[in-house]
């Protein structure tokens, strides 16, 4: 009897051990999920979508290239006289057969197409969930198409998941024209909008983010095709955004941790402070100047830095806003209350005498001085701004205070601007990171201060 008990007990232990080994060893990779799991619920499908969002949003913010592309628009300019030199992409002198502006994004397009196809075929998702996931896939694919179009004009439009053995299916020709490219961009983004969520968690795009990006794409499409239908779409979709999304009372907080979930943020880009540095982002490190207290002293600036070490600005700026962008911030006329360009207000005209740029022909004609070390500094002349492409006229304004005026010319230019101007643009007399900024000749942040 005892032997039987022992045998049965031993067999029980062996059976338990075998079962334990089977459960323990029959595992799956911990870093991947099978398709049934991914497309088996809205939560797991959204996890796949969110990972794809991270790859796509970098085309527009947070990457080393996005700010460079923005500097090739009327909004920004890249200006570096040190290591980087002239932008070889903008001049086309730096483009050759190895230049890659996204031609090989087939892996990313495959992810977008998988989102669309797998969601449509899922038997676990509800019809409403399917529609939303598919919309997100169309949104993402439309943005990839948009980035390819704005950089290259034509691209290979992969719109389905292609398997390794489907060689014929992979023979997809490039779009025939910029017109066809933008047609595909707009089709995807328009198809996405009706089923995109109206509200989303921070970091996820909403219907209004899709409408905003579609409006932007349509403006560029019109610039190339001149088709009025694109302007109609801009009005329709941009109006829906402005009518349903409120503006923030804390505009400056939109860009930092003080108001990180503001309702005006339609698609936020978030990173943890613990493992994120200013130096990781071109939008930050390449927009801050590199100026020391010694530079201010040598430049004879009347305003020195408050920072006891004199190192408030330790970036390496090469990207700057254009005059075209700055001029879009209108100034309130002190007499009429009308919003006008800065040089058309009554206060400016009454106090400033405009100088015809054609009369400025000599170096130092308007203003010049020597720094402590003997380096000459002067106001630029039109000859300093000559360019080879006459299609882009230089935006120059010269002026001086009229005799007897007690106003400050910088104050006349910048006071009363659009309320968001001060949070977007660094200008003469403003406060930036706790320091008073001078951009006038010889000022602590002026051209040539170093």
Go through each PLM region and give its residues.
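Bacterial Sec-dependent N-terminal signal peptides
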Residues: 1-30
């Amino acid at each position: 009897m005892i032997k039987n008990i022992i045998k049965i007990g031993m067999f029980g232990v062996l059976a338990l051990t075998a079962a334990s080994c089977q459960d323990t060893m029959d595992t799956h990779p911990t870093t991947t999920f099978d398709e049934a799991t991914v497309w088996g619920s809205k939560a797991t499908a959204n996890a796949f979508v969110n990972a794809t969002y991270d790859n796509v949003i970098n085309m527009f913010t947070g990457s080393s290239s996005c700010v460079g592309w923005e500097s090739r628009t009327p909004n920004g300019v890249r200006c570096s006289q040190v290591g980087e030199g002239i932008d070889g992409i903008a001049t086309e002198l730096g483009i050759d057969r190895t230049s890659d502006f996204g031609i090989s994004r087939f892996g990313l397009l495959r992810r977008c197409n998988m989102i669309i196809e797998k969601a449509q075929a899922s038997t676990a998702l509800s019809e409403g969930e399917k529609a939303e996931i598919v919309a997100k896939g169309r949104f993402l694919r439309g943005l990839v198409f948009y980035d390819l179009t704005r950089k290259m004009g034509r691209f290979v439009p992969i719109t389905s998941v292609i398997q390794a053995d489907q060689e014929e299916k992979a023979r997809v020709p490039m779009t025939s024209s910029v017109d066809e490219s933008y047609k595909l961009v707009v089709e995807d983004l328009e198809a996405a909008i009706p089923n995109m969520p109206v509200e989303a968690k921070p970091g996820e795009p909403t219907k209004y983010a899709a409408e905003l990006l579609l409006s932007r794409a349509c403006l560029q499409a019109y610039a190339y095709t001149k088709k009025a239908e694109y302007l109609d779409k801009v009005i329709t979709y941009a109006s829906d955004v402005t009518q349903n999304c409120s503006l923030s009372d804390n505009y400056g907080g939109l860009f930092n941790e003080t108001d990180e979930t503001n309702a005006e943020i339609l698609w936020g880009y978030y990173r943890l402070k613990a493992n994120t540095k200013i130096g990781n982002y071109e939008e930050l490190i390449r927009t801050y100047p590199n100026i020391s207290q010694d530079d201010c002293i040598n430049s004879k600036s009347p305003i020195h830095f408050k920072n006891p070490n004199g190192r408030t600005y330790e970036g390496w700026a090469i990207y700057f806003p254009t005059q075209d962008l700055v001029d879009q911030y209108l100034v309130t006329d002190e007499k009429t209350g009308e919003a006008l360009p800065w040089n058309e207000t009554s206060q400016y005209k009454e106090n400033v005498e405009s100088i015809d740029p054609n009369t400025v022909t000599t170096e130092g004609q308007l203003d010049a001085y020597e720094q402590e070390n003997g380096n000459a500094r002067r106001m630029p002349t039109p000859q300093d701004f000559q360019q080879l492409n006459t299609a882009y006229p230089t935006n120059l304004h010269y002026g001086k205070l009229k005799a007897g005026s007690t106003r400050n010319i910088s104050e006349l230019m910048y006071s009363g601007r659009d309320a968001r101007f001060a949070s977007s643009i660094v200008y003469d007399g403003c406060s930036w990171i706790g320091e008073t900024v001078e951009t006038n000749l010889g000022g602590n942040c002026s051209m040539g201060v170093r």
